[in-house]
């Protein structure tokens, strides 16, 4: 009758056991971080959605109020005068050949260093005077919500450490502007549209918009818009130009 010989299992070296324990701990930690990140993302997505809903409601309310006031004015035989625009969108349409030093300096202050670059500008006495100085070299007017959204979603870039980085996620917004309560792209759009209290910080964080040449081209760059050209203030008609260049 054969006898079974007991075999001894060689002990696992302590170094390997330590490596296994470390690997298992890392796996557990990664899993915990993954769950924590999922919960955080879920909470943030809920916040983003609620903010977007709030802004849409606010925009609709403003629009309905304007329609109501216009109807009242019409029924009473008067005219409804909408509130003065608070924000302009300025597009550089001419080069610097022959530009005198003062307009050249203003173009630099406006960050309009290249042709077909566009920027948002908060309208006040000082900025209006600056725009008058550079009117022969720019086209500007009052962007609507649709234009602002399309510009930011399609051509928005953030200035991060002096570099032009595509605006591709809400995380980027929060890292750059979270200290001002701006945590998502819709916050940026709202701040620009309403000319909010952090307009300056938000606008400075946006790289100038690089636009295309307008479909169909310009008519007469050197001629004022009111005389059938392209230069200067075109008020709400700037939205047509933005659409052609975006």
From Swiss-Prot:
SUPFAM superfamilies: Ribosomal protein L30p/L7e. Transmembrane segments: none annotated. The gene is rpl7. GO terms for molecular function: RNA binding; structural constituent of ribosome. Coiled coil: none annotated. One of its GO terms (cellular component) is cytosolic large ribosomal subunit. GO terms for biological process: maturation of LSU-rRNA from tricistronic rRNA transcript (SSU-rRNA, 5.8S rRNA, LSU-rRNA). PROSITE patterns: RIBOSOMAL_L30. The lineage of its organism: Eukaryota, Amoebozoa, Evosea, Eumycetozoa, Dictyostelia. Belongs to the universal ribosomal protein uL30 family. Keywords: Ribonucleoprotein, Ribosomal protein, RNA-binding. This is Large ribosomal subunit protein uL30. InterPro entries: Ribo_uL30_ferredoxin-like_sf, Ribosomal_uL30, Ribosomal_uL30_CS, Ribosomal_uL30_euk, Ribosomal_uL30_euk_arc, Ribosomal_uL30_ferredoxin-like, Ribosomal_uL30_N_euk. Binds to G-rich structures in 28S rRNA and in mRNAs. Plays a regulatory role in the translation apparatus; inhibits cell-free translation of mRNAs.
């Amino acid at each position: 009758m054969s006898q079974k010989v007991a075999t001894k299992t060689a002990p696992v070296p302590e170094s390997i056991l330590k490596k296994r324990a470390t690997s298992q701990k890392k796996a557990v930690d990664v899993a915990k971080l993954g769950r924590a990140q999922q919960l955080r993302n879920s909470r943030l997505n809920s916040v983003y959605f609620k903010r977007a809903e709030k802004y849409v409601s606010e925009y609709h309310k403003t629009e309905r109020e304007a329609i109501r006031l216009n109807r009242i004015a019409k029924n009473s035989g008067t005219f409804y005068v909408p509130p003065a625009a608070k924000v302009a969108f300025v597009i550089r349409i001419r080069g610097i050949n022959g530009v005198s030093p003062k307009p050249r300096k203003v173009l630099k202050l406006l960050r309009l260093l290249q042709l077909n670059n566009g920027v948002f500008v908060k309208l006040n006495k000082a900025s209006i005077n600056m725009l008058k100085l550079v009117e022969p070299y720019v086209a500007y007017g009052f962007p609507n919500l649709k234009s602002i959204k399309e510009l930011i979603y399609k051509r928005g870039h953030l200035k991060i450490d002096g570099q032009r980085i595509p605006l591709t996620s809400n995380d980027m917004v929060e890292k750059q502007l979270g200290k001002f309560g701006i945590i998502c792209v819709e916050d940026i759009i709202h701040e620009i549209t309403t000319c909010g209290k952090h307009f300056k910080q938000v606008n400075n964080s946006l790289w100038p918009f690089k636009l295309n040449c307008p479909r169909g081209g310009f008519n007469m760059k050197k001629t004022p818009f009111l005389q059938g050209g392209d230069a200067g203030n075109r008020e709400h008609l700037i939205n047509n130009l933005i659409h052609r260049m975006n």
